[in-house]
UniProtKB/Swiss-Prot annotation:
<dbReference type="InterPro" id="IPR001406">
    <property type="entry name" value="PsdUridine_synth_TruA"/>
</dbReference>
<protein>
    <recommendedName>
        <fullName>tRNA pseudouridine synthase A</fullName>
        <ecNumber>5.4.99.12</ecNumber>
    </recommendedName>
</protein>
<dbReference type="Pfam" id="PF01416">
    <property type="entry name" value="PseudoU_synth_1"/>
</dbReference>
<feature type="binding site">
    <location>
        <position position="113"/>
    </location>
    <ligand>
        <name>substrate</name>
    </ligand>
</feature>
<comment type="function">
    <text>Formation of pseudouridine at positions 38, 39 and 40 in the anticodon stem and loop of transfer RNAs.</text>
</comment>
<dbReference type="InterPro" id="IPR020103">
    <property type="entry name" value="PsdUridine_synth_cat_dom_sf"/>
</dbReference>
<feature type="active site" description="Nucleophile">
    <location>
        <position position="52"/>
    </location>
</feature>
<dbReference type="GO" id="GO:0031119">
    <property type="term" value="P:tRNA pseudouridine synthesis"/>
</dbReference>
<keyword id="KW-0819">tRNA processing</keyword>
<dbReference type="GO" id="GO:0160147">
    <property type="term" value="F:tRNA pseudouridine(38-40) synthase activity"/>
</dbReference>
<comment type="subunit">
    <text>Homodimer.</text>
</comment>
<comment type="similarity">
    <text>Belongs to the tRNA pseudouridine synthase TruA family.</text>
</comment>
<dbReference type="InterPro" id="IPR020097">
    <property type="entry name" value="PsdUridine_synth_TruA_a/b_dom"/>
</dbReference>
<dbReference type="GO" id="GO:0003723">
    <property type="term" value="F:RNA binding"/>
</dbReference>
<dbReference type="InterPro" id="IPR020094">
    <property type="entry name" value="TruA/RsuA/RluB/E/F_N"/>
</dbReference>
<keyword id="KW-0413">Isomerase</keyword>
<dbReference type="InterPro" id="IPR020095">
    <property type="entry name" value="PsdUridine_synth_TruA_C"/>
</dbReference>
Length: 247
């Protein structure tokens, strides 16, 4: 059976997340329905990351197996047509044939995420579900300085969900940068893999630094506590984007 690699963009606002669930529409389910409508095949696709409800993607990667061969551009266009017809906020950006041993999740060597904060007094209208609105001024330089305390190999118990199913809290964070362009603050994170709610936990804690409520030393102390209770507030899902996967 030929295997295909899909690069997927989606607005996660109205989905329960990437993974198929019984309590509402999922991105995985939307694509699987489009495949069924197109090919009459029931497939199970695997994504590189299981984004939560409200989290967006600009470069999620998934793979699926089909019984017949398709030209990549034909499959891409056809799936997009079926997704659009169903009113889904999902777009297939690219389709490529993949080797049989390619796995969107387990073949990944690096994942890239972006968290967007808009720091201004006025509420968001156009980007209300695409960024975290923070009405207070934030010191992005202090946030970036603090973020560097988290880079490297650490026990990230403080910054993972209490419901995280990973067997180990140890992860290697390759990059955590905070930059600003006008009212937009961007937090970019790179690692081979992340724990559940890890980036949103980073963002919420870094916001405390930006407000002057925490210092970089406070953030490091939270990391070293290895205690979920030491974490700052978890940032909302609206500002989080799954940007890219390296293989």
């Amino acid at each position: 059976m030929p295997r295909y690699r899909l690069t997927v963009e989606y607005d996660g606002s109205d989905y329960v997340g990437w993974q198929r669930q019984d309590n509402g529409p999922s991105v995985q389910g939307a694509i699987e329905k489009a495949v069924l409508s197109l090919t009459r095949e029931t497939v199970s696709i695997r994504g590189a990351g299981r984004t939560d409800s409200g989290v967006h993607a600009r470069g999620q990667v998934a793979h699926l197996d089909l019984t017949r061969e398709w030209k990549s551009y034909t499959l891409q266009n056809a799936l997009n047509a079926h997704l659009a017809l169903a009113g889904e906020r999902v777009s297939i950006l690219d389709v490529a044939e993949a080797p049989g041993d390619f796995d969107a999740r387990f073949s990944a060597i690096r994942r890239h995420y972006l968290y967007r904060i808009i720091s201004r007094r006025s509420p968001l209208a156009l980007e209300a579900r695409r960024a975290w609105w923070v009405p207070k001024p934030l010191d992005h330089d202090a946030m970036h300085e603090a973020a560097q305390r988290l880079v490297g190999h650490h026990d990230f118990t403080t910054f993972r969900s209490a419901h995280c199913q990973a067997t180990s809290p140890l992860r290697t964070l390759d990059r955590l940068d905070v930059t600003r362009a006008g009212e937009l603050i961007e937090i970019r994170a790179t690692a081979q893999s992340f724990l559940h709610n890890q980036i949103r936990s980073f963002a919420g804690s870094l916001k405390l630094v930006g407000e002057g409520k925490w210092t970089p030393d406070d953030l490091q102390a939270a990391l070293e506590a290895r205690d979920r209770k030491a974490c700052g507030p978890v940032a909302p899902p609206d500002g989080l984007y799954f940007m890219r996967v390296d293989y």
